[in-house]
Curated annotation (Swiss-Prot):
InterPro entries reported for this sequence: 3PPDioc_HcaF, HcaF, NTF2-like_dom_sf, Rng_hydr_dOase-bsu
Keyword Oxidoreductase assigned: yes
Top-level lineage group: Bacteria
Pathway annotation from the record: Aromatic compound metabolism; 3-phenylpropanoate degradation
Record-linked CDD domains: ring_hydroxylating_dioxygenases_beta (cd00667)
Gene3D superfamilies attached to this UniProt entry: 3.10.450.50
Catalytic reactions on record: 3-phenylpropanoate + NADH + O2 + H(+) = 3-(cis-5,6-dihydroxycyclohexa-1,3-dien-1-yl)propanoate + NAD(+); (E)-cinnamate + NADH + O2 + H(+) = (2E)-3-(cis-5,6-dihydroxycyclohexa-1,3-dien-1-yl)prop-2-enoate + NAD(+)
Name of the protein: 3-phenylpropionate/cinnamic acid dioxygenase subunit beta
Length: 172
Protein backbone atom coordinates (compact mmCIF):
# COMPACT_ATOMS: atom_id res chain seq x y z
CA UNK A 1 0.00 0.00 0.00
CA UNK A 2 1.04 3.59 -0.58
CA UNK A 3 1.14 6.37 1.97
CA UNK A 4 -1.47 6.31 4.70
CA UNK A 5 -3.94 9.20 4.80
CA UNK A 6 -4.46 11.84 7.49
CA UNK A 7 -6.76 11.14 10.43
CA UNK A 8 -9.29 13.64 9.08
CA UNK A 9 -9.38 11.98 5.66
CA UNK A 10 -9.53 8.53 7.28
CA UNK A 11 -12.53 9.70 9.30
CA UNK A 12 -14.33 11.11 6.23
CA UNK A 13 -13.84 7.95 4.19
CA UNK A 14 -14.82 5.73 7.12
CA UNK A 15 -18.00 7.76 7.62
CA UNK A 16 -18.81 7.36 3.93
CA UNK A 17 -18.44 3.57 4.26
CA UNK A 18 -20.55 3.46 7.45
CA UNK A 19 -23.29 5.49 5.73
CA UNK A 20 -23.17 3.19 2.71
CA UNK A 21 -23.55 0.14 4.99
CA UNK A 22 -26.58 1.68 6.72
CA UNK A 23 -28.24 2.33 3.35
CA UNK A 24 -27.96 -1.37 2.54
CA UNK A 25 -29.26 -2.41 5.97
CA UNK A 26 -32.22 -0.04 5.63
CA UNK A 27 -33.07 -1.30 2.11
CA UNK A 28 -32.45 2.17 0.64
CA UNK A 29 -31.02 0.66 -2.49
CA UNK A 30 -31.65 3.65 -4.78
CA UNK A 31 -29.77 5.89 -2.34
CA UNK A 32 -27.01 3.27 -2.23
CA UNK A 33 -26.79 3.26 -6.04
CA UNK A 34 -26.29 7.03 -5.93
CA UNK A 35 -23.11 6.41 -3.89
CA UNK A 36 -21.60 4.34 -6.71
CA UNK A 37 -19.36 5.72 -9.42
CA UNK A 38 -20.62 5.22 -12.98
CA UNK A 39 -17.53 3.05 -13.60
CA UNK A 40 -18.06 0.81 -10.54
CA UNK A 41 -16.49 -2.63 -10.67
CA UNK A 42 -18.25 -4.82 -8.06
CA UNK A 43 -16.72 -8.27 -7.78
CA UNK A 44 -16.65 -11.43 -5.70
CA UNK A 45 -14.82 -14.62 -6.62
CA UNK A 46 -15.06 -18.09 -5.23
CA UNK A 47 -12.62 -18.87 -2.44
CA UNK A 48 -10.47 -21.90 -3.09
CA UNK A 49 -8.46 -23.66 -0.42
CA UNK A 50 -4.83 -23.92 -1.53
CA UNK A 51 -2.15 -26.13 -0.07
CA UNK A 52 0.55 -24.31 1.90
CA UNK A 53 3.29 -25.58 -0.43
CA UNK A 54 1.43 -24.13 -3.44
CA UNK A 55 0.85 -20.77 -1.76
CA UNK A 56 4.58 -20.50 -0.99
CA UNK A 57 5.33 -21.00 -4.69
CA UNK A 58 2.83 -18.31 -5.63
CA UNK A 59 0.49 -20.81 -7.27
CA UNK A 60 -3.07 -19.54 -7.09
CA UNK A 61 -5.84 -22.03 -7.79
CA UNK A 62 -8.32 -20.95 -10.46
CA UNK A 63 -11.45 -19.20 -9.25
CA UNK A 64 -14.84 -18.37 -10.69
CA UNK A 65 -16.75 -15.11 -10.50
CA UNK A 66 -19.70 -15.04 -8.14
CA UNK A 67 -20.31 -11.45 -9.22
CA UNK A 68 -18.51 -9.27 -11.71
CA UNK A 69 -21.03 -6.44 -11.92
CA UNK A 70 -21.14 -3.00 -13.46
CA UNK A 71 -23.43 -0.22 -12.29
CA UNK A 72 -26.01 -1.21 -14.90
CA UNK A 73 -26.05 -4.79 -13.61
CA UNK A 74 -26.39 -3.60 -10.00
CA UNK A 75 -29.30 -1.35 -11.05
CA UNK A 76 -31.01 -4.37 -12.63
CA UNK A 77 -30.49 -6.45 -9.47
CA UNK A 78 -32.09 -3.71 -7.42
CA UNK A 79 -34.94 -3.20 -9.88
CA UNK A 80 -35.69 -6.91 -9.55
CA UNK A 81 -35.73 -6.65 -5.74
CA UNK A 82 -38.19 -3.76 -6.03
CA UNK A 83 -40.68 -5.80 -8.08
CA UNK A 84 -41.59 -8.03 -5.16
CA UNK A 85 -41.00 -10.97 -7.51
CA UNK A 86 -37.48 -11.78 -6.26
CA UNK A 87 -38.51 -14.92 -4.42
CA UNK A 88 -35.13 -15.24 -2.70
CA UNK A 89 -36.02 -12.04 -0.83
CA UNK A 90 -39.58 -12.91 0.19
CA UNK A 91 -39.86 -12.07 2.96
CA UNK A 92 -37.03 -9.52 2.74
CA UNK A 93 -33.79 -10.29 4.52
CA UNK A 94 -32.79 -8.32 7.57
CA UNK A 95 -29.10 -7.49 7.33
CA UNK A 96 -26.44 -5.89 9.44
CA UNK A 97 -23.19 -4.83 7.79
CA UNK A 98 -20.29 -4.51 10.23
CA UNK A 99 -16.96 -3.19 9.01
CA UNK A 100 -13.73 -2.89 10.96
CA UNK A 101 -9.94 -2.71 10.70
CA UNK A 102 -10.27 0.08 8.13
CA UNK A 103 -6.95 0.73 6.38
CA UNK A 104 -6.88 3.59 3.89
CA UNK A 105 -4.05 4.68 1.63
CA UNK A 106 -3.42 6.93 -1.31
CA UNK A 107 -3.21 5.55 -4.84
CA UNK A 108 -1.36 6.80 -7.90
CA UNK A 109 -4.61 8.38 -9.10
CA UNK A 110 -5.42 11.80 -7.59
CA UNK A 111 -8.50 11.77 -5.30
CA UNK A 112 -8.78 7.97 -5.44
CA UNK A 113 -8.07 6.05 -2.25
CA UNK A 114 -7.56 2.34 -1.59
CA UNK A 115 -9.50 0.94 1.35
CA UNK A 116 -9.16 -2.44 2.98
CA UNK A 117 -11.76 -3.43 5.58
CA UNK A 118 -12.76 -6.61 7.33
CA UNK A 119 -16.49 -7.19 7.27
CA UNK A 120 -19.15 -9.30 8.83
CA UNK A 121 -22.51 -9.39 7.09
CA UNK A 122 -25.28 -10.92 9.18
CA UNK A 123 -28.43 -11.93 7.35
CA UNK A 124 -31.68 -13.11 8.96
CA UNK A 125 -34.70 -14.21 6.98
CA UNK A 126 -37.98 -15.84 7.93
CA UNK A 127 -38.02 -17.25 11.44
CA UNK A 128 -34.83 -19.29 11.57
CA UNK A 129 -32.66 -18.66 8.54
CA UNK A 130 -29.44 -16.98 9.60
CA UNK A 131 -26.24 -16.56 7.64
CA UNK A 132 -22.92 -14.93 8.44
CA UNK A 133 -20.61 -13.79 5.66
CA UNK A 134 -17.11 -12.88 6.86
CA UNK A 135 -14.13 -11.65 4.92
CA UNK A 136 -12.18 -8.73 3.56
CA UNK A 137 -13.24 -6.03 1.13
CA UNK A 138 -10.85 -4.13 -1.10
CA UNK A 139 -12.55 -0.88 -2.10
CA UNK A 140 -11.50 2.16 -4.05
CA UNK A 141 -13.29 5.42 -3.34
CA UNK A 142 -13.18 8.64 -5.32
CA UNK A 143 -13.41 12.10 -3.76
CA UNK A 144 -15.51 14.45 -5.87
CA UNK A 145 -14.92 18.20 -6.17
CA UNK A 146 -17.82 18.96 -3.80
CA UNK A 147 -16.12 16.76 -1.15
CA UNK A 148 -18.64 13.96 -1.66
CA UNK A 149 -17.51 10.40 -2.25
CA UNK A 150 -18.26 7.62 -4.73
CA UNK A 151 -17.45 3.94 -4.57
CA UNK A 152 -15.30 3.13 -7.59
CA UNK A 153 -14.38 -0.52 -6.94
CA UNK A 154 -15.37 -3.23 -4.51
CA UNK A 155 -13.67 -6.62 -4.48
CA UNK A 156 -15.27 -8.90 -1.89
CA UNK A 157 -13.23 -11.81 -0.55
CA UNK A 158 -15.13 -14.37 1.51
CA UNK A 159 -13.33 -16.37 4.16
CA UNK A 160 -15.76 -19.25 3.53
CA UNK A 161 -14.87 -21.65 0.74
CA UNK A 162 -18.38 -23.14 0.91
CA UNK A 163 -21.39 -20.83 0.93
CA UNK A 164 -24.10 -22.50 2.99
CA UNK A 165 -26.86 -19.94 2.49
CA UNK A 166 -29.84 -20.70 0.26
CA UNK A 167 -28.90 -17.87 -2.10
CA UNK A 168 -26.60 -14.89 -2.41
CA UNK A 169 -29.05 -12.07 -3.06
CA UNK A 170 -27.68 -9.61 -0.49
CA UNK A 171 -25.35 -6.76 -1.34
CA UNK A 172 -21.99 -6.43 0.36
Amino acid sequence: MSAQVSLELHHRISQFLFHEASLLDDWKFRDWLAQLDEEICYTMRTTVNAQTRDRRKGVQPPTTWIFNDTKDQLERRIARLETGMAWAEEPPSRTRHLISNCQISETDIPNVFAVRVNYLLYRAQKERDETFYVGTRFDKVRRLEDDNWRLLERDIVLDQAVITSHNLSVLF
